[in-house]
Amino acid sequence: MSYLLALDAGTGSVRAVIFDLHGNQISVGQAEWKHLSVENVPGSMEFDLDTNWRLACQCIHQALERAHLNAADIQSVACCSMREGIVLYDRNGDAIWACANVDARASREVAELKEIHDYRFESEVYDVSGQTLALSAMPRLLWLAHHRPDIYRNAATITMISDWLAAKLSGELAVDPSNAGTTGMLDLFSRDWRPALLDMAGLRADILSPVKETGTVLGAVTKAAASQSGLREGTPVVMGGGDVQLGCLGLGVVRAGQTAVLGGTFWQQVVNLPQVRTDPDMNIRVNPHVIPGMAQAESISFFTGLTMRWFRDAFCAEEKLIAERMGMDAYALLEEMANRVPAGSHGVMPIFSDAMHFKQWYHAAPSFINLSIDPEKCNKATLFRALEENAAIVSACNLAQISRFSGVTFESLVFAGGGAKGALWSQILSDVTGLPVRVPEVKEATALGCAIAAGTGAGLYNDMAATGEKLVKWSREFTPNPEHRELYDGMMQKWQAVYADQLGLVDSGLTTSMWQAPGLVRVPSPRPSP
């Protein structure tokens, strides 16, 4: 029997996942990794190339052993990763520096680049690439030019972290549009580099590697890589891509107008656009899909999953113990409790992530507003439900922004990731958005999408998009409760007004933003003196 291997480099861990050709997950090898903070470099988060390659190889060995497979059973390999993380190589093709997606050292360089063309440069970058400077590769390259000229001068090629893994396996350097698109240096419309953007930024444009579409063959596993990874020499290595876009492929979200909410540490609201375009208000990010010729509007809710974990760990020690004794997940127990709280959570309004404003991206200080001192109305179950409702409200706000600039009218959405495990959360998302919600069976949608790319490149599948639609299986479906629509519409309007006031407190220096984009310059709002 034939099998496919996906190597998935996430923010906090690396996974090697083996699938059969029917999309069934056979085994997984996983290892956590940590990124390196450089002394005296605030916001730095370097990617440990040597250690992380060893961990990736370890995961491949684990996956093969757990599946009881030989290397010859793996017909093809592809790699995917977190977006925004970049790797630089010297003229010999050896990696010399890398940073993770969360590296925020270049705040000053972001501000410096924004001043170009009388403060129009960021808009020019966005119009071409769908990206702003905050997460772009250009400020990081400029930081290296300023602070590590030895690395900058020696850099001959740039790729993404997924491409680094593929290069370690095959010896071939290239990027794909879905991941490289997040550098802010790739043309969203042509799906190729735009060297003029680097020229305008005063950066070298001779470091841009070849662009190959997801699902095309890059090379084959080398003898050296085979000895380290346990894979068979000569196994095809196929172009992978960005984690979110490949996740959409694994969910069958491959047609124009289709919509997904991916619920993890961050929540992404993703919409396949009928035509490639950007948002005139610069609120929404636009990325190349792994489907050739297609772009995705992507909005992001910050720390949604992390907020739930904080609430569980900070306030629900008793529930964690009870859940452990009952042999169930603590979140499932908290959902049971929250299910007894009426819709609207007695008016409690969580203030955590704002809706996405890509050009001016920051959030209020975390808080709960409108608490009651009645313990029957305001307790852990109430706050947990309020957090779930708020995550759905932020998602609905983000989807509304996408609809306004794209003209897409949503018919349904796919809900996947850790958040989708909760039946209550899935129902709340349906009620708040007014859309039918489908939850897939697959637990590793990104890895499955990556495996589909691997199989397509090896000739085992004829078409990536058609295969994604064929292999996805649905676990549950939820329909909106019309009785809750008016309530949630009113809650959304109130929350938006309250959140705007909370941002005013941040602007005045009275509270601290939960997160703000690197290089953001805010003008404090005038407030009356006491």
UniProtKB/Swiss-Prot annotation:
Protein EC: 2.7.1.189
Major subcellular location class: cytoplasm
A GO-annotated cellular component: cytoplasm
Gene Ontology MF annotations: autoinducer-2 kinase activity
Subcellular location: Cytoplasm
Keywords, ordered alphabetically: Cytoplasm, Kinase, Transferase
Gene Ontology biological process terms, A to Z: carbohydrate metabolic process; quorum sensing
InterPro entries: AI-2_kinase (IPR033676), ATPase_NBD (IPR043129), Carb_kinase_FGGY (IPR000577), FGGY_C (IPR018485), FGGY_Carb_Kinase (IPR050406), FGGY_N (IPR018484)
Pfam family, one: FGGY_N
Catalytic activity, reaction form: (S)-4,5-dihydroxypentane-2,3-dione + ATP = (2S)-2-hydroxy-3,4-dioxopentyl phosphate + ADP + H(+)
Its job: Catalyzes the phosphorylation of autoinducer-2 (AI-2) to phospho-AI-2, which subsequently inactivates the transcriptional regulator LsrR and leads to the transcription of the lsr operon. Phosphorylates the ring-open form of (S)-4,5-dihydroxypentane-2,3-dione (DPD), which is the precursor to all AI-2 signaling molecules, at the C5 position.
Family: Belongs to the FGGY kinase family.
Designated name of the protein: Autoinducer-2 kinase
UniProt source species: Enterobacter sp. (strain 638)
